[in-house]
């Protein structure tokens, strides 16, 4: 099997412990600026006046809409964060959702939210590595990777593991950031740490990955135009809540966040796209 060059981590790519450290450090930032959901918002045409929390829920609802699953069946959420999308999925479809994250702090927060919302019968969040899934083959009826797969050292391994635990014909729905123009090493040094990105691939790269891992791509939706306002909302939040951020972060780190974010916006606008991909396990 040929491994795609875009799936080979760079020598200094983040490890699992680095991803956990990132969320330990940035968790308070996202909580303050983004709220309870650790993912972007989606403002489709005609709904540009939504608040950030409303846009985040709209994106989650789109993921739910694109994921066929029946009541009582089992879904896997790879990189589930603090668990709110998993809870919303379980509530909407009355299915069991099993979420994994490499951040112990997110596990604790997710489990507390599950208890508070009385969803413990349907939603189960634990620590786990998406490249070494602790589940039997052919167990799940659907899977997600919602703004998480770019953290992982190998998309190929993640897709191989997802294919192993999914039943034939089951859907795998993911969101990812893909390159449309190659980032320079200097741009990577700015953009990758901002989101703890391990590697980026391309739209064609996904077709190649699916061909190698037993999936067929059914749909690729470019959501970039509706996602970009997340960056503007984040920049505004940093400005409006600077005092609260200054109480959390030392001056050096806060200064780095303020300096980096405008550069991240420029790179995002020209070099990458945000996509939602619907794939299905062959067979």
UniProtKB/Swiss-Prot annotation:
Leading EC class: transferase
Annotated SUPFAM superfamilies: S-adenosyl-L-methionine-dependent methyltransferases
Species for this entry: Herpetosiphon aurantiacus (strain ATCC 23779 / DSM 785 / 114-95)
Catalytic activity: (+)-kolavelool + S-adenosyl-L-methionine = (+)-O-methylkolavelool + S-adenosyl-L-homocysteine + H(+)
Function text: Involved in the biosynthesis of the diterpene (+)-O-methylkolavelool. Catalyzes the transfer of a methyl group from S-adenosyl-L-methionine to the hydroxy group of (+)-kolavelool, forming (+)-O-methylkolavelool.
Name of protein: (+)-O-methylkolavelool synthase
Residues that bind S-adenosyl-L-methionine: 106, 129-130, 151
Keyword S-adenosyl-L-methionine: yes
EC numbers for this chain: 2.1.1.347
Source taxon at top rank: Bacteria
GO biological process, alphabetically ordered: methylation
Keywords, ordered alphabetically: Methyltransferase, S-adenosyl-L-methionine, Transferase
Family: Belongs to the methyltransferase superfamily.
GO terms assigned for molecular function: methyltransferase activity
InterPro entries: Erg6_SMT_methyltransf, SAM-dependent_MTases_sf
């Amino acid at each position: 099997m040929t491994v795609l060059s875009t799936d080979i981590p760079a020598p200094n790519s983040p490890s699992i412990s680095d991803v956990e450290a990132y969320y330990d450090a940035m968790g308070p930032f996202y909580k303050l600026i983004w709220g309870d959901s650790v993912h972007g918002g989606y403002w489709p045409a005609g709904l540009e006046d939504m608040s950030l929390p409303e846009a985040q829920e709209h994106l989650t609802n789109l993921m739910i809409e694109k994921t066929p699953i029946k009541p009582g069946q089992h879904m896997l959420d790879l990189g589930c964060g603090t668990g709110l999308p998993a809870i919303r999925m379980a509530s909407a479809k009355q299915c069991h959702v099993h979420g994994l994250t490499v951040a112990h702090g997110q596990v604790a927060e997710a489990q507390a939210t599950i208890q508070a919302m009385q969803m413990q019968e349907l939603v189960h969040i634990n620590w786990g590595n998406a490249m070494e899934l602790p589940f039997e083959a052919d167990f799940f009826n659907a899977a997600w990777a919602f703004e998480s797969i770019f953290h992982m050292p190998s998309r190929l391994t993640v897709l191989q593991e997802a294919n192993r635990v999914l039943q034939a014909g089951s859907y795998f729905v993911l969101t990812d950031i893909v390159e449309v123009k190659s980032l320079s090493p200097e741009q990577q040094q700015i953009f990758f740490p901002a989101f703890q990105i391990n590697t980026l691939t391309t739209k064609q790269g996904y077709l190649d990955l699916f061909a190698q891992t037993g999936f067929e791509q059914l749909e690729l939706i470019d959501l970039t135009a509706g996602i970009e306002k997340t960056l503007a909302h984040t920049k505004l939040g940093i400005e409006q809540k600077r005092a609260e951020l200054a109480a959390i972060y030392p001056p050096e780190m806060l200064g780095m966040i303020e300096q980096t974010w405008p550069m991240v916006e420029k790179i995002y606008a020209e070099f990458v796209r945000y996509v939602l991909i619907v794939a299905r396990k062959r067979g």
